[in-house]
């Protein structure tokens, strides 16, 4: 299955969320994850990510946080300093385990 890698940390562009046919993205404070048990491996999210953060790695991190964070089904704003962080390597230590807001349905 596809998962989100460290390139997403401190960016969280969310273009991928809108194209996912099965709503398998979950939102943390500064990172998104894909629930690998829900992902159907269609790959439509991969080319949508400006940070090139979607790949076949990081499976366990995505599985862990998909169980803890709220589901996200609509695109929201990227983090304010996303462009500053987009191409920086070695962001794993910056990953916040705090949940994001998720998608609130009214």
From Swiss-Prot:
From the UniProt record, which GO molecular function terms apply?
A: 3 iron, 4 sulfur cluster binding; 4 iron, 4 sulfur cluster binding; electron transfer activity; metal ion binding
Entry binding sites for [3Fe-4S] cluster: 8, 16, 49
Q: Where is this region: Disordered?
A: 80-106
* All copies of domain 4Fe-4S ferredoxin-type, residue ranges: 2-29, 30-59
Q: Which residues bind [4Fe-4S] cluster?
A: 20, 39, 42, 45
User: What keywords were assigned to this record?
Assistant: 3Fe-4S, 4Fe-4S, Electron transport, Iron, Iron-sulfur, Metal-binding, Repeat, Transport
**Which coenzyme or cofactor does it need?**
[4Fe-4S] cluster; [3Fe-4S] cluster
> What Pfam families does the database record attribute to this sequence?
DUF3470 (PF11953), Fer4 (PF00037)
Cofactor binding note: Binds 1 [4Fe-4S] cluster. Binds 1 [3Fe-4S] cluster.
Name the domain of life.
Bacteria
The function of this protein is:
Ferredoxins are iron-sulfur proteins that transfer electrons in a wide variety of metabolic reactions.
What protein am I looking at? Ferredoxin-2
| Organism listed in the record | Rhodospirillum rubrum
Q: List the lineage, top down.
A: Bacteria, Pseudomonadati, Pseudomonadota, Alphaproteobacteria, Rhodospirillales
């Amino acid at each position: 299955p596809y998962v989100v890698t460290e390139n997403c940390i401190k960016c969280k562009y969310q273009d991928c969320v809108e194209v996912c046919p099965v709503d398998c993205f979950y939102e943390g404070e500064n990172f998104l994850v894909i629930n690998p048990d829900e992902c159907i491996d269609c790959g439509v999210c991969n080319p949508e990510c400006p940070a090139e953060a979607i790949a076949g790695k990081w499976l366990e991190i995505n599985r862990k946080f998909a169980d803890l964070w709220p589901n996200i089904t609509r695109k929201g704003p990227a983090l304010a300093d996303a462009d500053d962080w987009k191409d920086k390597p070695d962001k794993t230590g910056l990953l916040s385990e705090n949940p994001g807001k998720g998608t609130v349905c009214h």
